[in-house]
Amino acid sequence: NDKENRVNGIALYYRLPMVQVNDEQSFIEQAEWSMLVQLFNQRLQERIQSGELKTISGGTARSVKIAPDYQSLFFRVNARDDNMQDAANALMAELATIDQHGFSAEELDDVKSTRLTWLKNAVDQQAERDLRMLTSRLASSSLNNTPFLSPEETYQLSKRLWQQITVQSLAEKWQQLRKNQDAFWEQMVNNELAAKKALSPAAILALEKEYANKKLAAYIFPGRNLSLTVDADPQAEISSKETLAENLTSLTLSNGARVILAKSAGEEQKLQITAVSNKGDLSFPAQQKSLIALANKAVSGSGVGELSSSSLKRWSAENSVTMSSKVSGMNTLLSVSARTNNPEPGFQLINQRITHSTINDNIWASLQNAQIQALKTLDQRPAEKFAQQMYETRYADDRTKLLQENQIVQFTAADALAADRQLFSSPADITFVIVGNVSEDKLVALITRYLGSIKHSDSPLAAGKPLTRATDNASVTVKEQNEPVAQFSQWKRYDSRTPVNLATRMALDAFNVALAKDLRVNIREQASGAYSVSSRLSVDPQAKDISHLLAFTCQPERHDELLTLANEVMVKRLAKGISEQELNEYQQNVQRSLDIQQRSVQQLANTIVNSLIQYDDPAAWTEQEQLLKQMTVENVNTAVKQYLSHPVNTYTGVLLPK
């Protein structure tokens, strides 16, 4: 009984020796184990999306290293509405169908094609794969005692040796796994009702026998549609153009959308397209706000246009594009990465995600069910419950409240899709930030065709309003922590009255670096009993206020003493300000980041997007280098005293052991 687990479910585990990859035969064997896992996952997701499996809310197969030379391979499904019998039936049926019919050649070809494309992309993009990825692969190679293969070697070996992997060889591998005696069933439950519905060991074995003797129908692979059709507007055009700075251009399209074009100084072959909408979940009423991120997640898992979720995965691999989205309070970001030698698929994808997004009914039902389960079990996850209480305490706004089960149930897949589409319903409220080394002429044709053809919706969304701030100080204590540690947080809110510009923000950041160091030295290193400490400043440009979060984990009996010490450290540092040496260190670190930023497509795109959201100016960041040189100790300390001397409100909270 795992109280902190969000879902109930049943799993079958096998334990078996790790394959030590040291020759071609072991390379093939390792690939076969990996493909069995992928084939199971692909089929399970397809059957959930198609509505064939409505009795479960999800599932997965995985291989996990459990010892230097041993692995665990498991197959798990998640129950819906605590129904453990349905979950057991679903898993037994999946396993028995594979026992009887194996996997089809079409399924195997699809997995091979997608994986080979990913490996080929890794070879093509080797120059951009950073040092962390290289060290991670080196560490993995060392840990698993396997030869270190370059992306090129891995791709060429896979391309040649995977031809020996057939549905017959995988069927033999599957039977080898199923005959493995080192196996056990596990049922995970997070509440008493699910525990009562759990099957007895005898019932599990009887069910396994029943399905082994059942004649089950073979799975029919639905195939892949790999075409994405986009209707272009022949009337679309660029209505104005403005140079904002060197290598930074602003275009306005005839549909009202704005496009910012930037070139990076590096050699990357990457093109980043980010749509920034000035609508986010705060544009929605309290009854919907907390479901908008869930709707966005459902869209991401449902495919776009004519492409199903699985087809989109394959299409994206073949066209070297990736897509992600994020909903925040006042904005929604939709990011697509493409290649400079083939930028068109990136534009096609972002157009279709905005104009022809879909939500699969079965995916929505699964996510909805998971959200309800998470709500029901919130009491069992004290850290999450504590964070939610602190969030509600800092605001006097219904939009901070969690929805109840009846409100979640009322929100249909059609409602979720309509809400998600509203985030990008008005082109005039979208700015597209495009970063990469592609000629402007080539980009202009793609921008006009794919971004200029986005139409204005019939139901545009009003801009959101910031959360209403609580006006009274408050304190929260939750005594539900399962671990013998205390989690403490203190939020201080400062009213800036005027928008915080980039120069002020840099002064505040320089001060916070020095403050964080003080807190670390005084609390964590000298006053033992604190395990971690952090200091974070954030600015809300719409609400025109500044928040400072002090957070630490410590021995439960010492949280009051350490808070007093932390506040003394903050008062002393505010009175003292920062020194010349500390400012120099800050300037050097920021300058290093700026140098890297100019060469990195992703970092430059993030900087422009942040500039747009924080300062409503896509070119604000271009002043950073000059402002950095102009910073003085006096200016920093004056700004800090002006903005951080008088908190308007203080909210404290502590999560203590039971």
Annotate the PLM regions.
Residues 1-26, 30-31, 38-49, 109-113, ...:
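Proteolytic maturation boundary segments
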Residues 6-26, 44-162, 183-189, 267-300, ...:
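M16 family metallopeptidases and their MPP-like homologs
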Residues 33-37, 520-524:
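Long, His/Glu/Asp-enriched segments that create or flank divalent metal/ion-associated functional microenvironments
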Residues 37-38, 289-297, 513, 517:
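Active-site recognition of the HExxH zinc-binding catalytic motif
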Residues 165-169, 173, 358-359, 364, ...:
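Peptidyl-prolyl cis-trans isomerase
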Residues 360-366, 457-461, 577-578:
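Conserved short beta-strand edge segments in small beta-sheet-based binding/regulatory domains
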